[in-house]
C-alpha cells in the first residue's frame, strides 16, 4: 500500500507525443502538477487501448484540474512508439499524446507493487519466474508534494473508469481547498462535510432522501 507515502522515484525512457525521450521522471511534476499515473499490461492488446484512448479523450478535463496523465507498461519505448503510430481502426492508439513510460526492466511496476508473476530462487540458487512479469491495471493519484493519495489495482480483464479517476481528483482538490471530506459518490457542487460528529450528523440529515433513492 502506497497511499500516504512518497511515490517511488524513477527515471526511464518514455514516448511523449510521438517522440522518444530519455530520463523521464515524475519528479519533474513535484510542486507543479497533480499526476494520474496508471499502469497497463501490454501494448497491442485488447482492453488496454480502450483505456489509453479514453484517457486521451478526457485529457482536457484533467488539464482543467491542473493534472497530468502518465501511462506505463513493461513494453519497450519502440513498442510504445509503434503502437502510437498504428491507426485506431487497426487496434492502434494514434493520437495519444501524454507520456507512456517504458518499464523494460520491471523495476517501476515492482516499486509500485503492481507487477504480476512470481520470482523466486530455486534449490540450485537460480532465479526462477512463474507467470508473465507484466503490470496489473494500477492507478495512482499523486499530489503536488509527490505523495500518493489514491491507488486502485484491477486484475487484467477489468478495465477502469476514467470518470471515477476524475472524481477522485475533484475530491482531493475539494478537501485541500475547503478542508471538507467527500462522502460516497461525491461530485463537485454536492454537499461535503466537516470531519466531526456534528458534520456527519448534519450531512446524513440533509441527505437522507438521496440515500433512500440510491437504495
Regions found by a protein language model. Name each.
Residues 1-215:
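Chalcogenol-based redox active-site neighborhoods
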Amino acid at each position: 500500500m502506497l497511499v500516504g507515502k512518497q511515490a517511488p522515484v524513477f527515471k526511464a525512457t518514455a514516448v511523449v507525443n510521438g517522440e522518444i525521450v530519455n530520463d523521464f521522471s515524475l519528479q519533474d511534476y513535484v510542486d507543479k502538477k497533480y499526476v494520474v499515473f496508471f499502469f497497463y499490461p501490454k501494448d497491442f492488446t485488447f482492453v488496454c487501448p480502450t483505456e489509453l484512448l479514453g484517457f486521451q479523450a478526457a485529457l482536457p478535463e484533467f488539464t482543467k484540474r491542473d493534472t497530468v496523465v502518465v501511462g506505463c507498461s513493461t513494453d519497450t519505448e519502440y513498442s510504445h512508439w509503434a503502437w502510437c503510430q498504428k491507426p485506431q481502426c487497426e487496434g492502434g492508439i494514434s493520437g495519444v499524446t501524454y507520456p507512456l513510460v517504458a518499464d523494460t526492466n520491471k523495476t517501476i511496476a515492482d516499486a509500485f507493487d503492481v507487477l504480476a508473476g512470481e520470482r523466486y530462487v530455486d534449490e540450485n540458487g537460480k532465479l526462477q519466474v512463474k507467470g508473465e512479469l507484466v503490470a496489473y491495471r494500477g492507478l495512482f493519484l499523486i499530489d503536488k508534494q509527490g505523495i500518493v493519495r489514491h491507488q486502485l489495482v484491477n486484475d487484467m480483464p477489468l478495465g477502469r473508469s476514467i470518470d471515477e479517476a476524475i472524481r477522485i481528483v475533484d475530491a482531493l482538490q475539494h478537501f485541500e481547498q475547503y478542508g471538507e471530506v467527500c462522502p460516497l459518490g461525491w461530485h463537485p457542487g454536492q454537499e461535503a462535510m466537516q470531519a466531526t460528529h456534528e458534520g456527519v450528523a448534519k450531512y446524513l440529515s440533509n441527505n437522507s432522501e438521496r440515500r433512500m433513492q440510491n437504495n
